[in-house]
Amino acid sequence: MKFVAFERAKQGTGASRRLRISGKTPGIVYGGEGKPQLIELDHNALWHALKKEAFHSSILEMELGGATSKVLLRDVQYHPFRQLVQHIDFQRVDAKTRMHMKVPLHYKGEEESDAVKLDHNLVTHVMTELEVSCLPADLPEFIEVDLSGLKKNATLHVNDIKLPKGVKFVSHGKLNPVIVSAVPPLVSEEPAPAAEGAAPAEGAAAAAAGGKPAAKTAKPAAKK
């Protein structure tokens, strides 16, 4: 994806506020061989770009001052309750340096799996994105996971999926975490109906006959 940014001369709270009022979003681009540079972007164009998955997970082409450079989206600050992007950060990409990036997982074939078609399992996508390490040229926009072979009560782990060439999974704690699980549907247990012709309890029989249940017989007094 490609977007246009403009050089920003002024910084500070007041300058940023005036930018937002004029329909612009303040930002910064850093990293690589260049110095950190203040930028500004058209807010409406940025707002629509942020709705696209690729803007968050792929290498972007930023046009700035007549030159184009490759960058990654690194941070977005939103207003707490208004539809407003308050600030945005981009990082320059070095073609020879491995990078860490979260890549979306795209699942397919779930409805054709035995777990769903035959056993009516409930399939849970435990993970929706994967943090990976790779060179910029090897960064995938997304990783596709085929669930058509999923069996009942099965779990799928990171090691069960094939990562693109040059891409490695970055672990934080668990070396092989679960990404998908299939479990049987919950079945509510209903009370079993009374057997036909079964005799009702003594008290219930008396109530059904219109009378009151017989009182318990008093015990005889103990002899002195």
Swiss-Prot record:
Part of the 50S ribosomal subunit; part of the 5S rRNA/L5/L18/L25 subcomplex. Contacts the 5S rRNA. Binds to the 5S rRNA independently of L5 and L18. It comes from the Bacteria. Transmembrane segments: none annotated. The lineage of its organism: Bacteria, Pseudomonadati, Pseudomonadota, Betaproteobacteria, Burkholderiales. GO terms for molecular function: 5S rRNA binding; structural constituent of ribosome. This is Large ribosomal subunit protein bL25. This is one of the proteins that binds to the 5S RNA in the ribosome where it forms part of the central protuberance. Residues 190-224 are annotated as: Disordered.
